[in-house]
């Protein structure tokens, strides 16, 4: 009698994307960097305590890369996320929106259990 070796089926699903940095966001960052006149600038996205829901997002330009930063590149622009913030941003999408209410960077975060009406504060 012949025995057939069976192996568990491999999970063919793609691993989750750690962070999505949209074309719109990258284009706006490129414009802002050009206005500053410093091509070494990178957009740093971070999470800190505060806001009406417990955590809030922050954006700043930085020309330094820290040892614990994760870098994301899109269309020649670099996005930096520190290790503490990264755990709250895994799977999030960073976009730039312009509408009749104004323009702003927007984070769609699947880890947020509640969000504030302003969109810059969340709880996880």
From Swiss-Prot:
Cofactor requirements of the protein: iron-sulfur cluster
Q: Which GO terms describe its molecular function?
A: 2 iron, 2 sulfur cluster binding; 4 iron, 4 sulfur cluster binding; iron ion binding
Q: How is the quaternary structure described? A: Homodimer.
The record's similarity note reads: Belongs to the HesB/IscA family.
Q: Which HAMAP family match?
A: Fe_S_insert_ErpA
Q: Describe the function of this protein.
A: Required for insertion of 4Fe-4S clusters.
| Name this protein carries in UniProt | Putative iron-sulfur cluster insertion protein ErpA
Organism encoding this protein: Polynucleobacter asymbioticus (strain DSM 18221 / CIP 109841 / QLW-P1DMWA-1) (Polynucleobacter necessarius subsp. asymbioticus)
What is the organism lineage in this UniProt record? Bacteria, Pseudomonadati, Pseudomonadota, Betaproteobacteria, Burkholderiales
């Amino acid at each position: 009698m012949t025995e057939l070796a069976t192996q568990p089926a491999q999970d063919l699903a793609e691993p989750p994307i750690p962070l999505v940095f949209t074309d719109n966001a990258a284009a706006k960052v490129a414009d802002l960097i050009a206005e500053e006149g410093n091509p070494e600038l990178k957009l740093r996205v971070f999470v800190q305590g505060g806001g009406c829901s417990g955590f809030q997002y922050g954006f700043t330009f930085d020309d330094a890369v820290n040892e614990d930063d994760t870098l994301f590149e899109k269309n020649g622009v670099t996005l930096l996320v520190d290790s503490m913030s990264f755990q709250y941003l895994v799977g999030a999408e960073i976009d730039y929106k312009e509408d009749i209410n104004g323009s702003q960077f927007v984070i769609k975060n699947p880890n947020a259990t509640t969000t504030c009406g302003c969109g810059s504060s969340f709880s996880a």
